[in-house]
Swiss-Prot record:
Pfam families: SMC_hinge, SMC_N
Xref: InterPro entries: P-loop_NTPase (IPR027417), RecF/RecN/SMC_N (IPR003395), SMC (IPR024704), SMC_hinge (IPR010935), SMC_hinge_sf (IPR036277), SMC_prok (IPR011890)
PANTHER family cross-referenced by the UniProt entry: STRUCTURAL MAINTENANCE OF CHROMOSOMES SMC FAMILY MEMBER (PTHR18937)
Biased composition (Low complexity): 330-349
Any Gene Ontology CC annotation: cytoplasm
Coiled-coil segments: 166-508, 673-790, 820-1011
Region (Disordered): 330-351, 652-679
Chain ranges of the SMC hinge domain: 521-634
Chain sites annotated for binding ATP: 32-39
Assembly and binders: Homodimer.
Family as reported in the entry's similarity comment: Belongs to the SMC family.
Native species: Thermosynechococcus vestitus (strain NIES-2133 / IAM M-273 / BP-1)
Protein name, UniProt field: Chromosome partition protein Smc
Domain notes: Contains large globular domains required for ATP hydrolysis at each terminus and a third globular domain forming a flexible SMC hinge near the middle of the molecule. These domains are separated by coiled-coil structures.
Length: 1168
């Protein structure tokens, strides 16, 4: 793209319409001073809207109209400039600006692109599409180089800001900050309402807790009262039921006892009479004979049992012997049967052997006779044998010749068939190979398409990874920048807090201040600094804590030891330390309900849970009372403090009076003191930074995971692409292999064709020769058959056949005889073994029979003994029965009746005593029941509540008294606080949800601002680095020296300016302000060229930028422009000879007689 044509109508010194054609490359405009050279560049600025009237050397836009037009007195005069760009060889793009000025001095200015009206902003948007920027340096006028030299460092840095697009980011940041201010304003309004609701909620919470506690106590008292009524009624009813049951039971028992006493008396009288009678009968009879007979009978019974056991054992042994004998006899019979069978088989085999021996002898004689006959016939047929042998040899020779031929014929036929079959196989293989080639070609096409698709996927993944890495880098840079700001703000806050801490009087004595200012790790603060109290209870709690408010709380005892060592070393006095790791855990405080008592002092202090052991140590079980009068009732029982500051000890000591504490330690109030606006501002910014860092850390983790995932996906895609590429290469190799196989198949087919032709030729020859050989062989066989048909030969053959048959018969007979002999030997050995077994079995049977006879004798003896014992037992039992019938019955009755009589007497006495005791108890119970019946029970609640079984009536009465005292102590109570607290809590929750949404929105906006800030820094840094590199290169070309751009504040470029540092050849390093005029111009031009190279445009226009340079520097500048003109169109206004000589063409400008500027063009390349 370049400027193809410039058309001016009544513009400044150009009267009428002047068309100036332009070409690509390097063009110089030259002419006398005041001829209107610079007006051409002003026309470009005017048409493209790149400068105002001041930039075009006019006070007002109407001054741009040619003066000859204004002097003619027309009501409206007009000037028009058209710039035509060549986009390519055929396409043009025109920009036209018209300025119409009225006689009154008013004017209108319009723009048109390709004859279509547009606004200036629309024109600039289209120009930017062609890399022509209003803030760029496409047109460098006479004053631009001078202004570059004279401008301050900040303005020079702002040039790079414009090129880097910093203004766009500033605009986005400003918009985000406006939205942030709106969000903050809403959040502040909500915070005010939140604080009011929190205060209201806290107040209502305390009142609600008090009301709920009062309500719970009241409900508990009502429940206990119901329990008391139920327990009283239950006790009354249970006592009545119990007495009635006892009375009824006793009455029934008394009736039964009376009946039993009468019955027992009658039974004892009858038993005494019977016992007396039995005693007289027993004395009349003797007992010694009875005892002797019993002993004899027992002895006989023992002998009988012993004999019976022996008899059972003998019987068992007899059964075993009988079984063994039966088994032996059965085995003996089986062995006898086997012996008879073997004897019969042996006799039969001996009978069969005799005929076999006779047959073998006869066969041997016949065989010898046949052998003699064969020998005689062989001598007579010698001549026949010779002729037969010759015929046989000839037949063999023909067969020897014919068989290889037949074999060869078969081989050739088979070879021909194989070759034809092989040809068919090769044809099929070639067909299959063509199919494989087609499939392989399809696979190659598919693989190539897949590779192309994977390459596109790789490109997409690489772009996504680059974008993700860029986002991660931006997030990381933002995170590091905010971290640096956080550290800076934290240091600033520490300094502010240190100054604020210096004016606070909450650090106790010198020792405490020294410890707190030493920054020892683990020092948590004074007791007074760790708790907050309400103003109402502050005096009482400070009096109760006393000097312990100045104790120093530390994390553990090692910190306390280090602090004590510091006090010793600095000689700063003494202090008490409370290490958290050694303080005893607080014990639960028992519920207290005393008149005038507010609560335990420990419960009135607000502190973090970790400091519970500290404040339990400070206050212990101290109680806070409303007044001294209420506390005096419990003097000596508790440690108490009143709201006015009186202290009552358990020992009875009382401390009180007036007190002034100008410098004592104080508890913190419920609301912390207001901080200064500066501290609050720093603290708010730290909070924002902390939220932003947390959010950035989350985003960095997420982005890092995305980068890792994309890297993994890209690596896998690369691996898949390599696999697919390898597969494609393998397919290509397979295709090459198939091509080689196809060539090999063609070669084999050609070879098989040759082999088949040769085999068929040889086969034809053999098929002609074989019939001749077969005919000759047939003739020889006929002659041999005729020879063999002679009578002598037939007789010899018959005898020979008989001999062979007889030899077979003889051999079979000899084998049969040998088998019979072998069987006879086996039978003899079996028979001998069986005879030995029979003998052993017979001996065993005899032994068992002997043992059986002995057992029968023993059994007979035992039977005799048992019979004798049975007779004796029978006689003894008869004697005992006789005595027993006379004595045993009477004696047993006597003993039994005597025992029964004693038991009856004992039972009667016991029953009589129980009867008397029960009568007394029954009288007492009847009196108690009469008394209970006269008492009426109180009304009971419905339904009846369940009372714990472990609680007695006295326990419930004590609980009711304690609950009544606690309720009286808690009055008055706001019972509406319960409902009001819930409503306030709901409103606060809804408001906090809105605040959470606003906080998230604010964090998002802050993060967006910080990201824009990071992009702003990155964009500036990229532009600065590129322009600095361009400046170094260009300055080295123009001045034979070196130079660079220097930021005044590299850490924060926007906080400082930009300096041009140059080192001309042969001179020390200098800043721009200390250079000469020519050096300044060269340095400024180097900077302008660096800016142009950073943001290249299709054309550049310079207006006498070489006016302050000497000849040598003009030559360098001209050479630089000549080199740059290869990439862009350069239009330079100059009067210097080196510049004109370096140009490709020159446009001459002069002032005509009619005061209009005229131009003429000259192509310098046509004049070498």
């Amino acid at each position: 793209m370049y400027i193809k044509r410039l058309e001016l109508t009544n513009f400044k010194s150009f009267g009428g319409t002047t068309v100036i054609p332009l070409l690509p490359g390097f063009t110089v405009i030259s002419g006398p001073n005041g001829s209107g050279k610079s007006n051409l560049l002003d026309a470009l600025l005017f048409a493209l809207g790149l400068a105002g009237s001041k930039g075009m050397r006019a006070e007002r836009l109407p001054d741009l109209v040619n003066h000859s037009q204004t002097r003619r007195g027309h009501s409206v005069v007009e000037t028009r400039v058209t710039v035509t760009f060549a986009l390519d060889a055929e396409t043009e793009w025109r920009v036209t600006r018209r300025l119409r000025v009225t006689k009154q001095g008013s004017y209108t200015s319009t723009y048109a692109v390709n004859d279509q009206p547009c606004t200036l902003n629309e024109l600039h948007d289209q120009l930017q599409a062609f890399c022509i920027y209003p803030q760029g340096y496409n047109v460098v006028l006479q004053g631009d180089v001078t202004s570059m030299i004279s401008m301050n460092a900040k303005a020079r840095r702002e040039i790079i800001d414009e090129l880097a697009g910093v203004a766009d980011f500033d605009r986005k940041i400003a918009q985000a900050r406006e939205k942030l201010d709106t969000v903050k304003e809403r959040e502040e309004r909500f915070r005010i309402v939140e604080r009011e609701l929190i205060q209201q909620r806290d107040r209502l919470q305390r009142e609600r807790l008090h009301a709920e506690k009062y309500q719970a106590l009241r409900l508990e008292l009502q429940e206990r009262e119901q329990w008391l009524l139920v327990r009283q009624w239950q006790a009354h009813e249970e006592q009545k039921v119990q007495l009635q049951a006892q009375i009824q039971t006793l009455q029934q028992e008394q009736t039964q006892r009376q009946e039993q006493l009468q019955q027992k008396a009658q039974e004892m009288a009858a038993a005494a009479v019977t016992l007396e009678q039995l005693n007289r009968q027993v004395k009349a009879l003797g007992e010694e004979e009875y005892l002797r007979l019993q002993a004899t009978l027992a002895d006989l019974h023992a002998q009988q049992r012993q004999c019976q056991r022996q008899q059972a054992a003998n019987q068992q042994q007899q059964e075993q012997l009988a079984e063994q004998l039966q088994q032996g006899q059965a085995q003996y019979h089986r062995q006898q049967a086997q012996h008879r069978q073997l004897a019969e088989e042996l006799a039969q085999q001996r009978g069969d052997r005799t005929p076999l021996m006779t047959a073998v002898a006869n066969s041997q004689a016949t065989l010898e006779a046949l052998r003699q006959q064969v020998q005689e016939l062989s001598t007579a047929a010698q001549t026949w044998f010779q002729e037969h042998s010759q015929r046989r040899q000839r037949i063999d020779a023909l067969i020897h010749e014919l068989e290889p031929s037949r074999t060869e014929l078969s081989r050739l036929q088979e070879r021909s068939q194989q070759l034809r079959q092989r040809q068919g196989e090769l044809h099929q293989a070639a067909t299959a190979l063509e199919g494989q080639q087609l499939e392989l070609q399809d696979a190659l096409t598919t693989a190539a398409a897949a590779i192309k698709q994977q390459e596109q996927q790789l490109q997409t993944l690489a772009q996504q990874l680059a974008t993700a890495q860029q986002q991660l880098s931006r997030t990381e840079e933002t995170y590091q920048r905010l971290e640096r700001e956080q550290r800076q703000k934290q240091r600033e806050l520490d300094q502010l807090e240190a100054r604020q801490q210096a004016v606070q009087e909450t650090q106790g004595g010198f020792a405490a201040r020294l410890i707190l200012s030493a920054d020892l790790p683990g020092v948590l603060g004074l007791v007074a600094q760790l708790g907050q109290v309400e103003p109402r209870y502050q005096l009482a709690l400070e009096i109760a804590a006393g000097a312990r408010l100045g104790n120093i709380v530390v994390a553990d005892d090692s910190v306390a030891a280090a602090a004590i060592a510091l006090l010793k070393r600095e000689q700063a006095g003494r202090a008490t330390f409370l290490p958290l790791n050694k303080m005893a855990r607080p014990k639960p405080l028992s519920p207290i309900a005393l008149a005038g008592c507010i609560d335990y002092a420990l419960n009135l202090v607000t502190f973090e849970p970790q400091y519970a052991p500290i404040f339990a140590y400070v206050f212990g079980s101290t109680l806070v009372f409303e007044s001294l009068e209420a506390a005096r009732e419990y003097l000596g029982q508790y440690r108490m403090v009143t709201l006015e500051g009186e202290l009552l000890e358990p020992s009875g000591a009382m401390t009180g009076g007036s007190q002034r504490r100008p410098n004592t330690l104080r508890f913190a109030q419920g609301v912390p003191p207001q901080e200064s606006a500066e501290v609050q501002q720093v603290r708010d910014r730290l909070g924002e930074l902390e939220r932003l860092l947390d959010r950035l850390l989350q985003e960095r983790t997420h982005q890092q995971g995305r980068v890792n995932a994309l890297s993994q996906a890209l690596s896998e895609a690369h691996q898949s692409h390599r696999d697919r590429q390898r597969q494609w290469e393998q397919l290509q190799q397979q295709q090459q292999q198939l091509n080689r196989q196809q060539a090999e198949l063609e070669r084999q087919q050609q070879y098989l064709s040759q082999e088949l032709t040769a085999a068929e030729t040889e086969l034809t020859h053999l098929e002609a020769r074989l019939p001749e050989l077969e005919a000759e062989l047939a003739a020889e066989r006929l002659a041999l058959n005729a020879l063999e048909a002679s009578p002598s030969h037939q007789q010899w053959q018959q005898v020979q056949a008989q001999l062979q048959a007889q030899e077979k018969i003889h051999a079979s007979q000899v084998a049969a005889l040998q088998a019979v002999d072998q069987a006879l030997g086996d039978r003899h050995r079996q028979l001998e073994q069986l005879e030995r077994d029979l003998k052993q079995t017979e001996q065993e049977i005899q032994r068992l029979c002997q043992a059986q006879r002995e057992m029968r004798c023993q059994q007979q003896a035992l039977d005799q003994t048992l019979g004798d014992l049975a007779t004796q037992i029978e006689r003894t039992q008869a004697a005992l029965r006789e005595l027993d019938s006379r004595l045993g019955h009477l004696k047993g009755d006597r003993d039994r009746h005597e025992y029964q009589l004693r038991q009856q007497q004992k039972n009667y006495q016991q029953l009589e005593w129980q009867y008397q005791k029960a009568s007394e108890t029954l009288t007492t119970l009847q009196a108690q029941l009469q008394e209970l019946s006269t008492i009426e029970p109180p009304p009971l609640p419905q339904p009846l509540p369940e009372v714990p079984a472990e609680l007695s009536l006295r326990d419930i009465q004590q609980q009711c008294q304690a609950l009544e005292q606690r309720l009286r102590a808690m009055e008055p109570v706001n019972m509406l606080a319960i409902q009001e607290f819930e409503e306030t809590q709901a409103r606060l929750k809804e408001l906090q949800e809105k605040l959470a949404v606003l906080a998230a929105e604010r964090t998002e906006i802050l993060l967006r601002i910080e990201n824009f800030t990071t992009l702003r820094h990155q964009s500036f840094r990229e532009a600065f680095d590129a322009i600095n590199a361009n400046f170094q290169t260009i300055f080295a070309t123009l001045s034979d020296g070196d130079g660079y751009l220097q930021l005044e504040s590299p850490e924060d470029p926007f906080a400082g300016g930009l300096n041009l540092v140059a080192h001309p050849k042969g001179k020390p390093v200098q800043r721009l302000a200390s250079m000469s005029g020519g050096e300044k111009s060269l340095t400024a031009l180097s900077f302008i060229f660096a800016l142009q190279r950073y943001r290249p445009s299709p054309f550049y226009a310079f207006d006498e930028v070489d006016m302050f340079l000497d000849g040598a520097n003009v030559e360098r500048l001209a050479k630089m422009i000549q080199q740059q003109s290869q990439q862009a169109q350069f239009i330079v206004v100059s009067l210097r000879r080196p510049m004109i000589e370096a140009a490709q063409r020159t446009i001459g400008v002069t002032q005509a007689r009619g005061q209009h500027t005229q131009v003429i063009g000259l192509d310098l390349t046509a004049y070498p």
